[in-house]
From Swiss-Prot:
This is Acetyl-coenzyme A carboxylase carboxyl transferase subunit alpha. The gene is accA. One of its GO terms (cellular component) is acetyl-CoA carboxylase complex. GO terms for molecular function: acetyl-CoA carboxylase activity; ATP binding; carboxyl- or carbamoyltransferase activity. PANTHER family: ACETYL-COENZYME A CARBOXYLASE CARBOXYL TRANSFERASE SUBUNIT ALPHA (PTHR42853), ACETYL-COENZYME A CARBOXYLASE CARBOXYL TRANSFERASE SUBUNIT ALPHA, CHLOROPLASTIC (PTHR42853:SF3). Component of the acetyl coenzyme A carboxylase (ACC) complex. First, biotin carboxylase catalyzes the carboxylation of biotin on its carrier protein (BCCP) and then the CO(2) group is transferred by the carboxyltransferase to acetyl-CoA to form malonyl-CoA. Pathway: Lipid metabolism; malonyl-CoA biosynthesis; malonyl-CoA from acetyl-CoA: step 1/1. InterPro entries: Acetyl_CoA_COase_a_su, ClpP/crotonase-like_dom_sf, COA_CT_C. Keywords: ATP-binding, Cytoplasm, Fatty acid biosynthesis, Fatty acid metabolism, Lipid biosynthesis, Lipid metabolism, Nucleotide-binding, Transferase. It is an enzyme of class 2 (transferase). It comes from Caulobacter vibrioides (strain NA1000 / CB15N) (Caulobacter crescentus). Acetyl-CoA carboxylase is a heterohexamer composed of biotin carboxyl carrier protein (AccB), biotin carboxylase (AccC) and two subunits each of ACCase subunit alpha (AccA) and ACCase subunit beta (AccD). Signal peptide: none annotated. Its main location: cytoplasm.
Length: 320
């Protein structure tokens, strides 16, 4: 897949184009003909990448969180979960591929894993409905959480959605109830649960998989009650002011950790998770492993209390 550059990455894109051009010339001029020049350009591109990503504003982080080449649920499963067996369907209506989940081994430990899947191209994005789950997806999630508790397996979730699907059929089949039931099941689980926001964390559609003991977030991910575009349309009747809304909503990982909404920020490679997906996936794996080890000796009652205390604290802080 060809590299996709965001607006603020244009200077980097220009350098990468020059590197490709010199590499092609090097093939005809002979081995090593432009090695010095190519390396100098690569070093400069890396410097620009570090500078750009060290100073992103909230709107730029939103763009990074939505980057089409950012790793998604199936990438994390492929990189972290061995012997993965996907489980489909909610046993009531259908199988919603916006949420994918199943059983597997995470670094040797049996787990239940699930999350939103957006897809990487037109075909898979349509198949997964761009990560916007219908009621069947959340009911499937509840089914998997029930199974995890029955067999005493930790739950690992990956959150990446603009929000639950707002279509007429979804509403007719009880979208709000399905989201509420999934959120409730998260909060009442008697097994360890770790959620990681790996891209967008949009509204109730995200929190339905994020009511965990520990909520992690990638460095350039976002988590909010509504999209910046939606907030701008409501507040100012102007979706073009999404950048202003993103700043005021405090949706970045750095804001969220100060507010106590998330527990840990997972650093991304220079240039974002999409620039080195393998490194990003393993960094998430290391963080999840740390959190699961910290909860290994906790009883079901302790896990439930820790989880409820965590979310009650968020509510109390909001009232102060």
């Amino acid at each position: 897949m060809a590299a996709h550059y965001l607006d603020f990455e244009r200077p980097i894109a220009d350098l990468e184009s020059k590197i490709e051009e010199l590499s092609r010339l090097s093939e005809t001029a002979g081995p090593g003909a432009f090695d010095t020049e190519i390396q100098a350009l690569r070093d400069r591109a890396q410097e620009l990448r570090k500078e750009a990503y060290a100073n992103l504003d909230a709107w730029q982080k939103t763009m990074v969180a939505r980057h089409p080449q950012r790793p998604h649920l199936r990438d994390y499963v492929a990189g972290l979960i061995d012997e993965f067996v996907e489980l489909r369907g909610d046993r009531k209506f259908a199988d919603d591929q916006a949420i994918v989940g199943g059983l597997g081994r995470f670094r040797g430990q049996p787990v239940v894993v699930m999350g939103h899947e957006k897809g990487h191209d037109t075909t898979t994005r349509l198949k997964h409905n761009f990560g916007m789950a219908r009621p069947e997806g959340y009911r499937k999630a509840v089914r998997l959480m029930d199974m995890a508790e029955r067999f005493n397996l930790p739950v690992i979730t990956f959150v990446d959605t603009a929000g639950a699907y707002p279509g007429l059929g979804a509403e007719e089949r009880g979208q709000a109830e399905a989201i509420a039931r999934s959120t409730e099941r998260c909060l009442t689980l008697g097994v360890p649960m770790v959620a990681t926001i790996v891209g967008e964390g949009g509204s109730g559609g995200a929190i339905a998989l994020a009511g965990a003991n520990r909520v992690l977030i990638l460095e350039h991910s976002i988590y909010s009650v509504i999209s910046p575009e939606g907030a701008a349309s409501i507040l100012w009747r102007d979706g073009a002011r999404a950048k202003d809304a993103a700043t005021q909503m405090r949706i970045t990982a750095q804001d969220l950790i100060k507010l106590g909404i998330v527990d840990r920020i997972v650093e991304e490679p220079a240039g974002g998770a999409h620039s080195d997906t393998e490194a990003a996936i393993q960094a998430v794996g290391d963080a999840v492993e740390d959190e699961l080890k910290a909860m290994a000796a906790m009883s079901p009652a302790e896990l439930k209390k820790q989880r409820s205390d965590r979310f009650y604290a968020i509510g109390r802080a909001g009232l102060q």
